[in-house]
Structure formats: C-alpha cells, structure tokens
Regions:
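Class I S-adenosyl-L-methionine
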Residues: 1-74, 96, 107-112
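Short, contiguous acidic/charged loop-to-helix segments that flank catalytic cores in large enzymes
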Residues: 43-51, 66, 75-78, 116-125, ...
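Short mixed-charge
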Residues: 137-149
Length: 238
C-alpha cells in the first residue's frame, strides 16, 4: 500500500509501515504498455494509431500516491497524447469517490491522411484525445463505482485563439478618422456570444469549469455561470 506524506513542498511515499523511495523500474504486469496501453486504447477506439501509449496503471498509481487524501487535486498533463492521464484520474475518482480534476493540453497535430485514424474521421491527435476521454468515461460509468462518487466524467474543451476584440486601443498613435467607429463597436464580427463569455471569464479569473446555462430574458439570450454567480448578455443595442 502506497500512501503519500507531505513534507514541506514535497512528498514522502509510505510503503506499508516504512518509508522508501518509489521504485524507478516497474515490472508488474499492470504496467505493460502493450496490454494496458495499446490494447486498452484500441478497445475504446479501434485503430487509434497510437503505438505503445502508457499503461493506464503506470499513471493511475503515481496519481493515487501523490494526491493521496487530497481528493480535490488538479492534475496537469501538458502532453496529453492518448489522454491516459485523464482516463486514470476518472478511474481513480470512480474507485475512491474522489473529485479530482484534470487539465489536458494537446496541440492539434495533424494526422497523416494515409493512416487508419484519419480514415476513421480523426484529423488531429487532439480529436483522438477527446474521444478517448468520452469513451473511457462511458466505460467507467458501466463498471463498479464508489458509492460516494459523483459520477462526473464530463470535460470542457477550450482552444487558444486570438482576442475577440479589434486592435483599436493598442495603437493610439495610429488612430485615424476611419477607426473611430471601432471604438464604439470593437468586437470582431465573427465572434459568438460564447466567445465573449469565455473572454470575460478569463479576464475576471473565473473558474472555466463552472457550470454554464443559458436562458431567455425579454427575448434576449442570457448566460448564467454557476447559478447566478455571473450573469451576462452580449446583445448589441442599436
């Protein structure tokens, strides 16, 4: 049994009743990247194209050891790939009733048109990452879960993009007569109300994972973030 013990900004790993370092070489069958990596991913997404992704348990066990009793921990994987980390976090939550969250980062690296994933409709690695999370979540919900678990396998996809605003306030020396109307309506024409909402959330430092709903008030679409913690409407009044 591995249990973490915080020591300042680091952790000691408790093994049974003694302390020791985590093994640097894992030979248990559960860490086999073919059986619990390649085959597992292909069982969720046939022809995923990933060769020897990490074993689910090779991520699950360190996450369990490091987060320990902190069941609200946030786990960041800056190279999501086949999204093994997301799968492991959801599985661990299902096993111990935790509410850990994951942040997966993946560039939309294109997939070769001649490869199986492309022929199955996946054009980027990021698309496979997202689909693995969806299907892994569904599979976990079908299995045996901790009675106290919230059964939350949802996730939100955010993409890095340019600003929603026209570049009008950043060139004071270049402001001309033709730019004056842009100081009144400075939102780019192709941006949606959802785009504007998330820019507000970012600017105000609001948690991007909070629940968002929409309603109609006097014929206008209104967004409600976390109930009524933030209410926003992005309708131009002319």
């Amino acid at each position: 049994m591995l249990r973490p013990k915080r020591s300042g900004e680091s952790y000691q790993i408790e093994i049974g009743k003694t302390f020791g370092l985590y093994k640097s070489v894992w030979t248990d069958k559960r860490y086999d990247s073919n059986e619990y990596g390649t085959k597992l991913v292909n069982s969720l997404i046939e022809g995923s194209g990933f060769t020897f992704p990490k074993s689910l348990w090779a991520v699950y066990d360190p996450v369990e050891a490091v987060t320990g009793k902190d069941k609200d921990a946030i786990i960041l994987d800056f190279f999501a790939g086949s999204a093994t980390t997301a799968h492991a976090v959801m599985q661990l939550n299902a096993d111990d009733g935790g509410n850990r969250q994951f942040i997966m980062v993946q560039v939309p690296a294109p997939i070769d048109e001649n490869l199986s994933p492309y022929k199955r409709g996946f054009t980027t690695i990021a698309e496979i990452s997202k689909e693995r999370i969806r299907r892994a979540g569904e599979k976990i919900l079908e299995g045996e879960c901790h009675a106290g678990w919230k059964r939350d396998v949802g996730f939100r996809v955010l993409k890095v993009d340019t600003s929603n605003m026209k570049d009008v306030f950043y060139r004071p020396n270049g402001l001309g007569q033709q730019d004056l109307l842009d100081t009144v309506e400075n939102t780019k024409a192709d941006r949606t109300p959802e785009d504007l909402l998330f820019q507000v959330l970012l600017d105000w430092g609001v948690d991007l994972t909070l629940p968002i709903s929409r309603g109609i008030v006097q014929g206008k679409t209104v967004f409600f973030v976390d109930g009524d913690a933030l209410v926003a409407c992005f309708v131009s009044i002319r």
